[in-house]
Amino acid sequence: MSIMMNLLQPLAFILPILIAVSFFTLVERKVISCMQPRKGPNITGPFGLLQPLADGLKLLFKEPVYPTNSSTTLFILTPTMALSLALSTWLPMPLPFSLVDLNLGLLFLLSMSSLMVFSILWSGWASNSKYALMGALRAVAQTISYEITLSLILLSMVLFSGGFNMRTFMTTQEQIYLIFSSWPLAMMWYISTLAETNRAPFDLAEGESELVSGFNVEYAGGPFAAFFMAEYTSILMMNTLSTILFLNPGFMYTSPTIFSISLMTTAVALSMGFLWIRATYPRFRYDQLMHLLWKNFLPITLAWCLWHISLLVTTSGIPPML
C-alpha cells in the first residue's frame, strides 16, 4: 500500500500541471485571436474546449521522424529530459504543500532551470542541422545570460526574507507585498522571465524568418510535443514563482483552499501578461536583447544587491527568520 501511495503522490502532483499546460495553450490561442479581428479555436467541442486534447492526440499518434545523420539516442532523450527537468522545478513549490519541502528550495529550482540549457544544446547538436544548431546556440546564450540577472534578483529577495525556503517569503510578506519595496527588481524579474522562457519579444531562438523553427526544427510528433509542454510548464512555473516572491498569495495561517485559489489567480494573471506582450510587441534584434542585459539589467541588479547587503550591515539588522 505504501509503495502504491509513493507512486500515486508524484502522479497526483504532476497530472494537474500537465492539464493546466494543455489548457494554457488554448487560452493563448483564444486571447491572441481576441486581440486580432478573428475567431480562435471554436469547432472541437463546446467553445473549442477539446482542442488541446485533439492537438495532443494528433501529435502523439504521428510517426516520429529521425534525420538520417542525427545522433539518434541523444535526439530521442533530449525532449524527455527537457520535460522532466521542467516538471522537477515544481517539486519545492508550496501549492500550498510542496511535494518535497527543501530548505534550499530556491537553489534547487535555479539549478534545475539551468540544467534545461543542456537539453536545448544537445537537441540542436543531435539534429545535425545548421538551423537547429544556430537556434540552440542562440537559446543557450540567451538563457545563460538572463540567468545571471535572475540569480542576483533572487539573492536580493533572499536578503529580504532570510532564507531559501519558499515559505519564508510568506512570513516576510504578512504585512506588505515585496513588490512595493522592490518594484524595480520585480519589473526586471518579469522581463527576465520572458527572456528565460524564450517568449516574445525575446523569442530569438525560434525566429521563423531566419532559423525556420530554432533548435526543435527537426522534431515532430511526440518529441515536439514534449518540447512544447516543457516550454509552457516553465512559463507557468516562472509566474507561480513570481507570485510567491513578490505577491504573497496567502498568509501563513490561511486555509489551503484560499491559498491555492489566490496563488492560481495571480499566476494566471501574470501568465496572461505574457500573452498580451506576445500579441503587442515585435521581436527584438539579438544585439538589443544582449545589450538590455549586460548594459542595463546587470549593473542595476548588482547595485541593488550591494545596497541590500550594505543596508543590513550598516543598520546591524537581520532579515526575519522562521
Curated annotation (Swiss-Prot):
Chain segments annotated as transmembrane: 7-27, 74-94, 104-124, 144-164, 176-196, 227-247, 257-277, 298-318
Keyword Disulfide bond recorded: no
Mitochondrion in keyword set: yes
Similarity annotation: Belongs to the complex I subunit 1 family.
Main location: mitochondrion
Enzymatic reactions: a ubiquinone + NADH + 5 H(+)(in) = a ubiquinol + NAD(+) + 4 H(+)(out)
GO cellular component, one term: mitochondrial inner membrane
Keywords: Electron transport, Membrane, Mitochondrion, Mitochondrion inner membrane, NAD, Respiratory chain, Translocase, Transmembrane, Transmembrane helix, Transport, Ubiquinone
Localization (cell): Mitochondrion inner membrane
BP-aspect Gene Ontology terms: aerobic respiration
Domain of life from the UniProt record: Eukaryota
Role according to the record: Core subunit of the mitochondrial membrane respiratory chain NADH dehydrogenase (Complex I) that is believed to belong to the minimal assembly required for catalysis. Complex I functions in the transfer of electrons from NADH to the respiratory chain. The immediate electron acceptor for the enzyme is believed to be ubiquinone.
Gene behind the chain: MT-ND1
InterPro entries named among the record's database cross-references: NADH_UbQ_OxRdtase_su1/FPO (IPR001694), NADH_UbQ_OxRdtase_su1_CS (IPR018086)
PROSITE patterns for the chain: COMPLEX1_ND1_1, COMPLEX1_ND1_2
Membrane topology: Multi-pass membrane protein
EC class of the enzyme, as a word: translocase
Enzyme Commission number: 7.1.1.2
Official protein name in the record: NADH-ubiquinone oxidoreductase chain 1
One function term, GO molecular function aspect: NADH dehydrogenase (ubiquinone) activity
